[in-house]
Curated annotation (Swiss-Prot):
Membrane-crossing segments per the record: 12-32, 46-66, 375-395, 403-423, 430-450, 476-496, 511-531
Modified sites of kind Phosphothreonine: T110, T328
CDD domains for this protein: GT2_HAS
Organism whose genome encodes this protein: Bos taurus
Protein name, UniProt field: Hyaluronan synthase 2
Pathways involved: Glycan biosynthesis; hyaluronan biosynthesis
Catalytic reaction(s) noted: [hyaluronan](n) + UDP-N-acetyl-alpha-D-glucosamine = N-acetyl-beta-D-glucosaminyl-(1->4)-[hyaluronan](n) + UDP + H(+); N-acetyl-beta-D-glucosaminyl-(1->4)-[hyaluronan](n) + UDP-alpha-D-glucuronate = [hyaluronan](n+1) + UDP + H(+)
Similarity field: Belongs to the NodC/HAS family.
Record-linked Pfam families: Glyco_tranf_2_3
Cross-link (Glycyl lysine isopeptide (Lys-Gly) (interchain with G-Cter in ubiquitin)): K190
GO molecular function terms attached to this record: hyaluronan synthase activity
Needed co-factor(s): Mg(2+)
Localization per Swiss-Prot or TrEMBL: Cell membrane; Endoplasmic reticulum membrane; Vesicle; Golgi apparatus membrane
Amino acid sequence: MHCERFLCILRIIGTTLFGVSLLLGITAAYIVGYQFIQTDNYYFSFGLYGAFLASHLIIQSLFAFLEHRKMKKSLETPIKLNKTVALCIAAYQEDPDYLRKCLQSVKRLTYPGIKVVMVIDGNSEDDLYMMDIFSEVMGRDKSATYIWKNNYHVKGPGETDESHKESSQHVTQLVLSNKSICTMQKWGGKREVMYTAFRALGRSVDYVQVCDSDTMLDPASSVEMVKVLEEDPMVGGVGGDVQILNKYDSWISFLSSVRYWMAFNIERACQSYFGCVQCISGPLGMYRNSLLHEFVEDWYNQEFMGSQCSFGDDRHLTNRVLSLGYATKYTARSKCLTETPIEYLRWLNQQTRWSKSYFREWLYNAMWFHKHHLWMTYEAVITGFFPFFLIATVIQLFYRGKIWNTLLFLLTVQLVGLIKSSFASCLRGNIVMVFMSLYSVLYMSSLLPAKMFAIATINKAGWGTSGRKTIVVNFIGLIPVSVWFTILLGGVIFTIYKESKKPFSESKQTVLIVGTLLYACYWVMLLTLYVVLINKCGRRKKGQQYDMVLDV
């Protein structure tokens, strides 16, 4: 016992020293600015910090590639499908078409005997349509429904402790005695809905799969995740490949679709190689039920800075698994399609909310670095502090008073994006990933200031994405973007003022003209390809009915 405690202390000290040393090393490399390659007049340079970031991308891609090879090798792994599985669907003001597609995909799941529990966040007449769709798709004679006036934590009007306990027991009994059940309950947020499903199921099943009501599941999605959990008893949770259902509806949803592929098949695949996936996504994930019930109460009652947390449910659920020392994995063999915002403002609000949960959970996650591979510490430091270095770099370049610095920054952003997207195109075998380089502009212009705003308002939970039936427009997300553009505009004005004081040399004029032409040609080429792709694929997808997720 004492030996284990001593080893634990050593691991805590070791991972802490590693993380601090890594951060100090990166900071020193950035401040010193040592250059390996440098041309006259600083038209081009490649330094120590740039080399470190390039190495990170290469190493991350390598381990992602190795993890995908492991996934392919497990293709023929035979397993016994004798474990019990329950699918929990969280629903809130869902678009009727998306909900119907979700439930139709649930009916096509190939895992035998899977139990379906859908909990609707809201019990008013306006929410009844979701229960009607559930009964229609799942079969009125094969499913049960229940309208609960309260939930596990809030009593209904005029309800006593005893009647509340009886209604809670009734919900539990309905869930345990029916293969398919839909219950409506008093509004309480997604975490309340998930808690109801987990609590009602109790320990009656081996594995619990989670799903959102805007998600279309591939028929084999449950089977593939069960395979991962069955192969290693120390894997506590597994997530699948989440793709975009409405990717051709707007430029935002299209760029999100290529970003999703990178996030899951490069970043999370790399994390999976080391058994430390940071977030098992809500649309497609599965957990060992025995673990869930070790922390479900703590998960529900999570507080941050004195307030109960109302977002980041999936990320904290993953963190709770990691806190017990269990691994979390990703499998590209389990797939689903999900809806993503098609309006810029709704996307921006969604990203801000996700950034809040990321930074909050980063702090929680840091307490368990010592229980996992050093890669978990390494990646947390890199991804957690990268936005701050990037902001410092952008401001520095824009306020140096040299127009070439601004142009070089724009060219570098696109070049790095093009290199990453080219590798992704090779790995995926689809040229569409080249558009990932366009996402870098969206990241620099919108997501970067949104991250800073998320930190500044990390304890505010009053806004985010709304239900899909009624879209609520929230303009607060434009505040950080407006501030960011004002800062950049100030740099541009300062640069024009400085450069106007002295004429350009002939060599400088040539470099600026060539750089501008390259940048313009790049945009013309990619935008032309985008228009062609949308015209070709977007029309084909409209009105198409999908029997399988993989058809999309």
